[in-house]
Amino acid sequence: MILIFGGTTEGRIVSSVLDESGKEYYYSTKGAFQEVDLVHGERVSGAMTHEVMRDFIREKDIHLVVDAAHPFAAVLHKTIGEVTAELGIPVLRYERKYSERTGKVIECASYEDMIKKLEAQPCHRLLALTGVNTIAPLKPFWEKHESFFRILDRDDSREKAEAAGFPFSHIRYFHEGEDQALFDEIQPDAVITKESGESGFFEEKIAPALAAGVPVYMITRPALPEHYEYVYGPVGLRKAVERLCPDFFPLKTGFTTGSTATAATAAALHALLHEGEVLTEAAILLPSGEEVKLPVERVEKTELGYKAMARKYSGDDPDVTHLTEICSEVV
């Protein structure tokens, strides 16, 4: 059995991939607000403590955990890491795409660090795009400086804002595509956000401020447990599930000859550029833009360069090239 921690766009993708198996699985979220269509999954709602998660995994005979939760769900990630390490359960992290850190925004390691940098600017009118859960930790700043927080138009978000004592006159609600209009209304002298990635509309959030020359401060995403294995799209997810839970999908998938040849070429090129360093797997980009890793069985020096071999795996599809050695030499 597989347990997904979702509540995100990535969680929806993971559930849709697992539904292709026709097998049951569990989909866990902290709240019941996300609308997600589960064909074969069973919804589980409510925060899990260490003990609750450990008992659930044991009781439901979970053999694989997929962490597709929000990157800033730090407590959940920590709990998943501790419980799975204790029980010896593998974890796949379905990771979202993040913008390259280019220095165009001011990075902050914590909310305390962010407050210090805002005070040093100094900032007198703040637009916070960090969400309702950041109102409380940023209270030392907004108690002294005019600040506007954008939150989701939901009762639970309003309850959290009220509990923190934040004035509702300075609350704005999220509406997709209205980043520029909100910036024009508030006219802030600083904007703060989180490193939320493409599915968190990171670039759209910061574009108005950057265009106006207004400083943008970003909370960097917290580190994840070291034993996590990362996948970056539906193909990589399915291949990893096939490897870790061999009986979950009735049919195994494979890669094309072209993808296999690309992996061999990447390994040969790497050896040529890095003094013969041998890769046992090579990362390639599929036409969809997803990064996947394919195994490389052999890398050897030739008279003019390096040659690598990757073996073609076609899965359960009938293919005469299945298990064929695909070689590529780079000179």
What residue spans do the PLM features occupy?
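Short, polar loop motifs at secondary-structure junctions
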Residues: 27-35, 94-99, 132-134, 152-157, ...
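A C-terminal functional module that forms or caps the active site or interfaces directly
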Residues: 160-212, 217-221
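Glycine/small-residue-rich loop that forms an oxyanion/phosphate-binding "nest" at active or ligand-binding sites
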Residues: 54, 60-114
